[in-house]
Amino acid sequence: MQDITMEARLAELESRLAFQEITIEELNLTVTAHEMEMAKLRNHLRLLTEKLKASQPSNIASQAEETPPPHY
């Protein structure tokens, strides 16, 4: 009887391990896909930021254009 119980427990553990391996592989694929999507989104955000900066002139004057403070 002890052998049957041990064999049943071993079979259950092997089954759980197999399902865990499948789950880990699926999660790995999901994480990899998300990393690739995030890289694309970062690049897109960088390009949009550059376009926005290029299209809007700055309202802040450069140092050369600034008038000196009144105490000079």
UniProtKB/Swiss-Prot annotation:
The organism's superkingdom is given as: Bacteria
InterPro entries named in the record? SlyX (IPR007236)
Give the matching Pfam families.
SlyX
Q: Name the residue ranges with Polar residues bias.
A: 55-65
Among Gene3D superfamilies, the record links this protein to: 1.20.5.300
Write out the ranges of the annotated region (Disordered): 53-72
**What family is this protein classified in?**
Belongs to the SlyX family.
Q: Which PANTHER family match?
A: PROTEIN SLYX
**Name of this chain's protein:** Protein SlyX
